[in-house]
Amino acid sequence: MNVHVEVVCITADGTEQRREVLGIERAELAMETLGLSLQEGKALLKGVQDWVVAQQVNENLERQRVCKHCGRRHSTKDAGSTPVKTVFGRVEVPNPRWHRCTCETTGARTFRPTKAWLQGRTSPELLHLETSGLRRSLSPKWRTC
């Protein structure tokens, strides 16, 4: 038996983009082959997380690519990425640097379009879980000794 897990992203304009995130093959049914292994489950989650992050960021970048003042596209200075820690592990977030449009005469010559929302390198949900876990571990009722 072959199983293929695919993620489908439907953009605002109705375009579908597909990506296979996991493919597994099972020959015989046995306790060892029942369901997903831990490794397969982690690979599935990582594949979905990476794809969703890439689609979200790329759609956001595409909306910002055109200069608000004159309509020309911002050219790329460099195409970097930033590692971000999430509840499900580390992901690489596209974080390009673009040249400011020639119609803009003030400010730096380059900018990062993700600056408005890419604050820090840890997701708020992970920070919340880490701090609530720390509070619990320091609380007298959670101490074991």
Residue ranges of predicted features:
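Short, positively charged, Gly/Tyr-enriched micro-motifs
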Residues: 90-145
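Short, conserved DNA-binding cores of transcription-related domains
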Residues: 1-102
